């Protein structure tokens, strides 16, 4: 699963997801992309599940790029713990995704295969997504 090797601070504040994505909004590496339509925290487990679903369908043909990285720790208190006594320990990692962000890219496969692979990947994610094709793509 994806997570940073080391971080400057172990715990972060929650923050809020205002507005649209400023960068990472166009297909850069492959010919096809999966774009986020709504904001969300995507966990490293969800990213991995989507990646596995795409790889299984594409049968290791072509190449997949993951354009998001879970760099935000989410802390959680232990079960049946009284309130107070500090913030909980980091439990899992999330990637903050805003609308318009390209999350996954693929290349080296026909459009029909890429469309189905991204559809399967989108089922593993907690947000609405859209299939994007590079403007200069020719079959």
Curated annotation (Swiss-Prot):
One of its GO terms (cellular component) is cytosolic large ribosomal subunit. One of its GO terms (molecular function) is structural constituent of ribosome. InterPro entries: Ribosomal_uL16, Ribosomal_uL16_bact-type, Ribosomal_uL16_CS, Ribosomal_uL16_dom, Ribosomal_uL16_sf. The keyword rRNA-binding applies. GO terms for biological process: translation. Keywords: Ribonucleoprotein, Ribosomal protein, RNA-binding, rRNA-binding, tRNA-binding. The keyword Nucleotide-binding does not apply. Belongs to the universal ribosomal protein uL16 family. Binds 23S rRNA and is also seen to make contacts with the A and possibly P site tRNAs. Part of the 50S ribosomal subunit. HAMAP family: Ribosomal_uL16. NCBIfam families: rplP_bact (TIGR01164). This is Large ribosomal subunit protein uL16.
């Amino acid at each position: 699963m994806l997570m940073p090797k080391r971080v400057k601070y172990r715990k972060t504040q929650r923050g809020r997801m205002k507005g649209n994505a400023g960068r990472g909004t166009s297909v850069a590496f492959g010919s096809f992309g999966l774009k986020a339509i709504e904001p969300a925290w995507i966990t490293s487990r969800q990213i991995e599940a989507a990646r596995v679903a795409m790889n299984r369908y594409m049968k290791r043909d072509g190449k997949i790029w993951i354009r998001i990285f879970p760099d935000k720790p989410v802390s959680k208190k232990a079960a049946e713990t009284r309130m107070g006594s500090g913030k909980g320990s980091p439990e899992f990692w999330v990637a903050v995704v805003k609308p318009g962000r390209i999350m996954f890219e693929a290349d080296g496969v026909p459009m029909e295969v890429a469309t189905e692979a991204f559809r399967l990947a989108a089922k593993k994610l907690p947000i609405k997504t859209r299939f994007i094709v590079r403007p200069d793509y020719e079959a």
